[in-house]
Amino acid sequence: VKTLVSDSYLKKRMSDYDPSKAGNSKDVKEGYIQEGEETTHFDVLDKDGNAVSVTTTLNGAFGCGIVVAGAGFLLNNEMDDFSVKPGVPNMFGAVGQEANAIAPGKRMLSSMTPAIVLNNNKPWIVVGTPGGTTIPTSVYTTIVDIIDFKLTPEQAVNYPKFHQQWLPDVIYVEENFNPTVITQLEAMDYKIEKRSSIGRTEVIMDNGNMITAVADKRGDDGASGY
């Protein structure tokens, strides 16, 4: 609803309107609103050090399209995360093999990567993100940026992201990714594709003296404390 009533969306909808002449009603099409990738993530850390990192998903748009009677929630279509046939990609372009084939009593491969990093056996970094197959990359790079490159949680979350998943043979980068790095990669014959955003990473970090919670600026995410 927020998008539907926003000035930017309304201006886009009116961009082909000409008040000087009659239009053809058949030319009026539905608007396009960028939907999320159907995955949600949240982190919790309390004063006693109890930590929770939860990623939950419908997988595709509206999951399998079935609503649980009397409960009002949709069932997912995580079956797509199985390999229907070796070498055939799923809806996220991930190519599966025989090891991930559909079989009774088997759990499908999933990209969901809710993570809790311990320091001296105590929760230190609580992190996760939605984003389909890009999830492991975003979680990994965020952790590495904090631990190895000494970035603050906010810097690590909002730093331009990239992703590569073996197949398709492409490196996805956000539009604000370092152009020098892109040029260097292209010079080595890597194929680069730009995306408006990759993931929406959430982080809570407890350094012993202070707890920091960071919500990704890429979406309408939020962080709060008590």
Regions found by a protein language model. Name each.
Residues 1-58, 70-71, 78, 86-89, ...:
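Internal maturation/activation junctions in enzymes
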Residues 31-35, 100-108, 193-196:
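Short Gly/Pro-enriched turn/cap motifs at secondary-structure boundaries
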Residues 37-42, 51, 110-115, 200-201:
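Short glycine-rich loop/turn motifs
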Residues 46, 117-118, 124:
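Extended hydrophobic
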Residues 51-119, 149, 153:
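Active-site rim segments in enzyme catalytic domains, especially the processed small/beta chain
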Residues 85, 106, 139, 148-196:
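Extended C-terminal subregions enriched in glycine
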Residues 129-151:
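Alpha-helical support elements that line or immediately flank enzyme active sites
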